[in-house]
From Swiss-Prot:
Enzyme Commission (EC) number: 6.3.5.-
The protein, known as: Glutamyl-tRNA(Gln) amidotransferase subunit D
Keywords recorded for this protein, A-Z: ATP-binding, Ligase, Nucleotide-binding, Protein biosynthesis
Any GO MF annotation of the entry: asparaginase activity
Pfam family, any one: GatD_N
Length: 418
């Protein structure tokens, strides 16, 4: 039984048929079924193997493309951190492989040749749930290198689970005149419903626009009509599987992009770039990693806060209830944090809306204990911002800056139509 063979595998009480795929575990057989889904089976539990059709061993070597630069098009660098958005499929085995040479990208999405001169580079190849602050720094360094080498726009292919964390981190870390677009895919490129190709087409188009800042680009609705460009500090993944999982929160998207006709329609004001400074990049990648994000719930114990304080944490972001509250039984832990110079700040777990700790006595008492209200900041954004502040400023200055807008993370007022 070799990769590419179509087989029938009999277990104790069921039978599976499909194409044998590469497996990372020698004790597991992975097959792709006709439904398009993969299944991994323990070799020890397989009672009988029947090869229904022999397949050719997959060959991944491809002749090079003649990719001449078009002087009329902008130079866009696509950086990969992992994820499925820019992978390619071996159609003999059904296996999905990273596609991050420029040749691979053009083969996977040939429409890119009409939009920009493409350069592909792998930074990381990880599942996004394994993202670390150290990897944010690596990504920022790679962005700086590409811009200094002539990139006029950056696209970052990223797994969707933590993409909004990375977008927030890069917003605080990177100051540049070029657009930095994070893009992902909710459906793998081996599925008919994949959103990968349209998302990357729209992302590259966005990267050619005369704008600056960090953005997230994903499907704007469940069909294949438009993609939305979201501000990097005002976006969140709000559905586990829908293709339009990413939404702007407390704000409208920056733009709507039609990937078929390559049309960008701006929905609100955007930061325009200064072309005279296009190669200038300033990085600030200093982070205090001893910051925690805690969700408040009925019965939450002060011992949780004490644990973080006793283990050297410098900052705590609370996802409070409603307008920014905790149970009174949690006040003891907040006092303990304050006594030990651990900065505590408050967001709301409602996601939409803003913290207002002046309405009820609970909120006012929390403020008296030193808790900083985070206005309409998303919890994940506040988490990253506090890491950034404590990595660069002292305790008192960090407290002062926490509730002030730095890179678009706070709105003075909320659009009620959002």
């Amino acid at each position: 039984m070799d990769i590419g063979d179509f087989v029938k595998l009999e277990l104790e009480n069921t039978t599976y048929s499909g194409t044998v795929m590469p497996s990372l575990n020698e004790d597991t057989v992975v097959i792709k079924m006709k439904s398009g889904y993969n299944v991994g089976l323990d070799k020890k539990k397989i009672k009988n193997i029947e090869i229904l059709e022999s397949g050719d061993k997959p060959k991944y070597g491809l002749p090079p493309l003649n990719l001449e630069k078009n002087p009329k098009l902008k130079n866009i660098s696509i950086l990969s951190t992992g994820g499925t958005v820019a992978s390619r499929v071996d159609y003999k085995t059904g296996a999905v492989h990273p596609a991050f040479t420029a040749d691979d990208l053009i083969r996977a999405v040939p429409e890119l040749m009409d939009i920009a001169n493409i350069k592909g580079k792998v930074i990381l190849n990880i599942l996004s749930e394994n993202m670390l602050p150290a990897y944010w720094k690596m990504t920022a360094d790679a962005i700086k290198e590409e811009i200094e080498n002539g990139a006029e726009g950056i696209v970052i292919a990223h797994g969707t689970d933590t993409m909004h964390y990375t977008a927030s981190a890069l917003s605080f870390m990177v100051t540049s005149e070029v657009p930095i677009i994070l893009v992902g895919a909710q459906r793998s490129s081996d599925r008919p419903s994949s959103d990968a190709a349209l998302n990357i087409i729209a992302a590259v188009k966005a990267a050619t626009e005369p704008i600056k800042g960090v953005y997230v680009l994903m499907h704007g609705e469940t069909g294949d009509t438009v993609c939305h460009l979201h501000e990097g500090t005002k976006v969140r993944k709000l559905h586990s599987s829908r293709r339009d999982a990413f939404k702007s929160v407390n704000e409208t998207p920056i733009a709507e992009i039609n990937p078929f006709i390559k049309k960008v329609t701006y929905l609100r004001d955007v930061k325009s770039q200064d072309k005279s400074k296009i190669k200038e990049v300033v990085l600030n990648t200093d982070l205090e990693e001893k910051v925690a994000l805690i969700k408040v719930y009925p019965g939450i114990d002060s011992e949780i806060l004490k644990f973080y304080v006793d283990n050297g944490y410098k900052g705590i972001i609370l996802e409070g209830t409603g307008l920014g509250h905790t149970p009174e039984t949690f006040f003891e832990g907040i006092d303990y944090a304050n006594e030990n110079n651990v900065l505590v700040a408050m967001t709301t777990q409602t996601i939409n809306g803003r913290v207002n700790m002046n309405v009820y006595s609970n909120g006012r008492e929390l403020q008296a204990k030193g808790v900083i209200p985070c206005e309409d900041m998303l919890p994940e954004v506040a988490f990253v911002k506090l890491m950034h502040l404590l990595g660069n400023y002292g305790f008192e200055e960090s407290k002062e800056l926490m509730s002030k807008n730095i890179v678009g993370e706070i709105n003075e007022s909320i659009n009620l139509e959002c």
